[in-house]
């Protein structure tokens, strides 16, 4: 009796065939398009690598997992109600100075303001705001030199939490003036790097 085997391209071990990173990143495509979310999705669409992200989360040490979960919980305050009365802004340059000052008082290391651009949006998203306020926060240099250690991982998660707290406080202040504002403490909703470059905070690394 002749044995019959499935062809090599038959995905007999997957309910959903895996998608490579090259495919997600558009390797070989000739037309420009927006980026697609890979990890830490906002929930706008099901991510191809969601199982790997879950594995990554479940394998981290418990105290780091808890810190990360707390950050996600705190980000529920990213948006909120507006003040009933809107404060006029006759001088946008002066207001920009005030916003930057408030952000630095809250702990930001650097602050920049830039228009929202197409390259900061993931595929399928729309711009809810015309302007982005971008902050940067330094990390402990000596700790991050050992980036693969648990201590460095804790420093990274703590920095995420610090950034979230700063931008949530800043957004709450803007809403208290009667203007819409939402805090984006993580990169699940927006691409932070293009905005940071446009805001004058830094430049794209070559690594």
Segments the model singles out, each with a brief description of its role:
Residues 93, 100, 104-207:
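Catalytic cores of enzyme domains
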Residues 1-113, 123-128:
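Iron-sulfur (Fe-S) cluster-binding modules
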């Amino acid at each position: 009796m002749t044995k019959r085997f499935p062809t090599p391209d038959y995905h007999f071990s997957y309910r959903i065939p895996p998608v490579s990173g090259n495919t997600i990143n558009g390797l070989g495509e000739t037309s420009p398009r927006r980026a697609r979310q890979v990890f830490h999705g906002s929930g706008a669409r099901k991510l191809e690598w969601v199982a790997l992200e879950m594995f990554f989360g479940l394998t981290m040490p418990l105290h780091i997992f808890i810190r990360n979960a707390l950050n996600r919980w705190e980000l529920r305050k990213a948006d909120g109600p507006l003040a009933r009365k809107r404060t006029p802004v006759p001088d946008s340059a002066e207001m920009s100075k005030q916003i930057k000052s408030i952000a630095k008082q809250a702990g930001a290391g650097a602050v920049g303001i830039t228009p929202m651009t197409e390259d900061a949006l993931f595929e399928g998203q729309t711009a809810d705001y015309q302007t982005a306020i971008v902050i940067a926060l330094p990390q402990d240099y000596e700790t991050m030199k050992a980036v693969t250690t648990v201590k460095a991982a804790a420093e990274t998660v703590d920095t995420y939490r610090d950034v979230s707290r700063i931008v949530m406080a800043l957004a709450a202040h803007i809403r208290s003036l009667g203007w819409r504002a939402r805090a984006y403490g993580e990169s699940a909703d927006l691409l932070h790097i293009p905005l940071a470059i446009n805001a004058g905070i830094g430049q794209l690394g070559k690594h």
